[in-house]
Structures are given as C-alpha cells and as structure tokens.
C-alpha cells in the first residue's frame, strides 16, 4: 500500500537519522511516522496532535499499515504531554507563531540529546530569528518545491555558542547556501522580489538593509 506523502513531508523524512526514535508533533493522519517505520528508517514513533480527530485517524492508519505496535499516541498541545524518550522531534505544516509557542512550552528540548526537524509554512524569517536568539543552530536546511510553493525544511540542534544569524541570514540561512539546492535561485528571487516590493511601497530602512545584504551574496 502506498503512503500518501507530500514532497514537504518526504523532505522531513530525509532529515531523520536511520534507527532513531521520533516524535511527530501535529501528526495529522500519521503518515510521516508510518512512512518512517515501514521503510525501516525510524524504530519507534510518538504521534501527537492537539485534536482528537486527527489522532484517531493516525491510530486507524497505523493499524492499517501494520505499525501500531511501534507507535504510541498522545493528545497533546505541542510537546507538553508526550514522553521524552525520543531522538528527533518533527514539526511540519505549522506557522512560525505555532512553532515558537511549542518550543517555548517545552524548554526541556534545549538539550543535545535531541535534534528537531521543522517545516515552517509561514513567517520563516521570524522563526530563524527566534531560533538563533534562543540558542538553536540550523545544522542543515533544504528547499523543497511542493506544487507552486517553495518551502524549507530545517534540521536544528541545541548549540548556544553558535554564531547568531544576521538579519539577511534570517531570510536565507548559511545552511541553505552551503547545501546549494537547485531551487535556491528561485527561492532567492522570490525573497528579494518581496523585499523590493516592500521597500518600494514604504520607507522601511530595515528591509532595505536586508535587501542590500542579500544582493551582496554570490549564488
């Protein structure tokens, strides 16, 4: 049976280290965990959601695909009510505000015991700024095209001594430049076009400085 995964979620799966235990926050139908288990990537999965409906759907799908014995299910607002015996925490399909709320409510995640895989839907520069300011390091970040939209998936680790991101790096991270995905040029164009539009329609010295920083990059 095929597991219906979007390109976004497939990109998240690629950032999970083989043999690790995962916690999928906001699991929806549970397909990411099921994909990781049926393909022998993860050895166990915690699936959590803030709503009962998606959690019941995830439980049904786990039984359908024969991995219910490797999964546990929790009704939880973010990571509040889940056990802590995992290696990787995955948050996908949420905006920056929600992700920041989840991280603020779980300060115990600030440990080298864990790494996080985040796929942010909106306000990604704000999320990068928050991560940098609170001791998280973006170890890897890739661009993924899903339909007509471009998203990024980042793998982050607790590293309080990591260099802080500049304002421009909150729009295009050093990890993205290092990876050099084929979609980078298009992503860069969309970001700089949006900044130019903002600068044209309103006198915003902060955005103007960010645009100048990004325009100085050699892609």
Q: What is each stretch, according to the model?
A:
Residues 51-53:
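Conserved SAM/SAH-binding beta-strand->alpha-helix loop
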Residues 160, 164-219:
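An accessory alpha-helical subdomain
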Residues 56-84:
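S-adenosyl-L-methionine
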Residues 105-155:
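C-terminal substrate-binding/active-site "lid" region of AdoMet-derived donor-dependent transferases
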Residues 19-28:
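Conserved class I S-adenosyl-L-methionine
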Residues 30, 34:
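Glycine-rich SAM-binding Motif I of class I
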Residues 44-49:
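Conserved SAM-binding motif I beta-strand of class I
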Residues 3-19:
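Conserved alpha-helix/loop element of class I SAM-dependent methyltransferases that forms part
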